[in-house]
Swiss-Prot record:
Family: Belongs to the class-II aminoacyl-tRNA synthetase family.
EC number(s) per entry: 6.1.1.21
A GO-annotated cellular component: cytoplasm
Enzyme class, spelled out: ligase
Organism encoding this protein: Pediococcus pentosaceus (strain ATCC 25745 / CCUG 21536 / LMG 10740 / 183-1w)
Protein name: Histidine--tRNA ligase
Domain of life: Bacteria
Length: 424
């Protein structure tokens, strides 16, 4: 029987795993500058964690969730996104308590699962990097979150970034807008797609996010949320814009933009790039916003949150296309060639000592002739080759060859520590 990976998954093989490490390390370095720390939550949660947070009408819950009953009869779901599990952990571990400095700032990275049609950059098992900050109602944390996403992408040298923002207002704003949207859409009910018909009275804002072309035409002239904001909601959004202006950040306000998850309110944003391998026109590579009711929804007190998420696979597609090359593995510092059976203990010691000095070091494991070992050193692009034969062993020395210049010299085994300065 021929075994293959499940549809919609991928094997991340060397040397491409280095690209993932590169992205993850840059994320960690960027987030640390903003005083964020890593959080790790389970890959699966109780189904209700996602159904209550994402919303019963969201595509994630109605179409895309991997859920099942386990052997104990518990309804379990593989996580389709990162925020809900982080919020659950925040509530369960009482991170809202007075002993924890506010805002609580965390980031996460790891696999997520959605049953979607696999396509380039969109798999059923995909990887997400995200951040969440809890405990501040200030527009400053909204702006900080946006800037952190921008800084991360700029650190990766992604060019042509476009920031799009909107507000979904507070509860009163949304209630007023919700009714206005229903009043506008009801006369078009029979023209709407089946999905939008089902959402009209449950969450009409999701109709604005429909991918159906006819739905998109209908909502072109729909009322805009900016006309229904309360004074407080307007003040919050104005502060966000003013702070972005202060930082010299260009942005576009798109009043029709909503988020695919039901828990967002106030500031939402997307960081886009135009005409890339991800698609023609503006394509979103990072998205997020504020969610002031989600902690309460999952059993906690009234605590606000704000965050973003981005897909690693899509980001790597973009990075590789922009650089026209894949990231290289760290170059091999030393390849140690052993000639003859009698020298193998010395080879073992030299390899070990070089690694203790933090040099990337390799040796032969296949009992090959010296010529084959030198070929391996060349293929692995080693900077230096150490050669130990029986005569070198007897004289307690080894030969050191610079593979770039071809220069070769002799080094005493007792002076191997002098190589510490060799690659500085």
């Amino acid at each position: 029987m021929k075994y293959q990976k499940p549809k919609g998954t991928a094997d991340i093989l060397p040397p491409f795993s280095k690209e993932w490490q590169f992205v993850e390390q840059n994320a960690r370095e960027t987030f640390a500058l903003y005083n964020y720390e890593e959080i790790r939550t389970p890959i699966f949660e109780k189904f209700e964690v996602f159904s209550r947070s994402a919303g019963d009408t969201s595509d994630i819950v109605t179409k895309e969730m991997y859920d099942f009953d386990d052997k104990g009869g518990r309804h379990i779901a593989l996580r389709p996104e990162g925020t809900a599990g982080v919020v659950r952990a925040f509530v369960e571990n009482k991170l809202y308590g007075p002993e924890h400095q506010k805002p609580v700032k965390v980031y996460y990275m790891g696999p997520m699962f959605r049953y979607e049609r696999p396509q380039s950059g969109r798999l059923r098992e995909f990887h997400q990097i995200g951040v969440e900050a809890f405990g501040s109602d200030s527009p400053k944390i909204d702006v900080e979150t946006i800037m952190m996403g921008m800084d991360f992408l700029k650190k990766l040298k992604v060019s042509g970034l476009k920031l799009v923002i909107n507000t979904l207002g507070d509860k009163e704003s949304r209630d007023r807008y919700r009714q206005a949207l229903i009043d506008y859409l009801e006369p078009h009910f029979e023209e709407l797609s089946d999905d939008s018909k089902a959402r009209l009275h449950k969450n009409p804002l999701r109709v604005l996010d429909s991918k159906d072309k006819n739905d998109q035409k209908i909502v072109e002239n729909a009322p805009e949320i900016l006309d229904f904001l309360t004074e407080d909601a307007q003040k919050h959004f104005t502060s966000v814009k003013e702070e972005l202006d202060t930082l010299g950040v260009d942005y576009v306000v798109d009043s029709s933009m909503v988020r695919g998850l039901d828990y967002y309110n106030h500031t939402i944003f997307e960081i886009m790039i135009a005409d890339s391998p991800l698609g023609k026109g503006d394509v979103t590579i990072c998205a997020g916003g504020r969610y002031n009711g989600l902690v309460e929804e999952l059993g906690g007190p009234e605590v606000s949150g704000v965050g973003f998420g981005l897909g690693v696979e899509r980001l790597l597609l973009l990075l590789n296309a922009e650089t026209q090359t894949t990231l290289q593995s760290k170059q091999l510092d030393f390849y140690v060639v052993g000639i003859g059976d009698l020298v193998q203990n010395d080879v073992l010691k030299v390899v070990h000592e070089l690694r203790q000095m933090n040099f990337v070091t390799e040796q032969d494991y296949l009992d090959r002739k010296p010529k084959a070992q030198f070929k391996s050193a060349d293929k692995l692009n080693a900077k230096y080759v150490v050669t130990i034969g029986e005569s070198e062993m007897n004289d307690r020395i080894f030969k050191l060859k610079d593979m770039h210049s071809g220069e070769e010299r002799t080094v005493a085994l007792s002076e191997i520590n002098t190589l510490k300065d060799l690659l500085k």
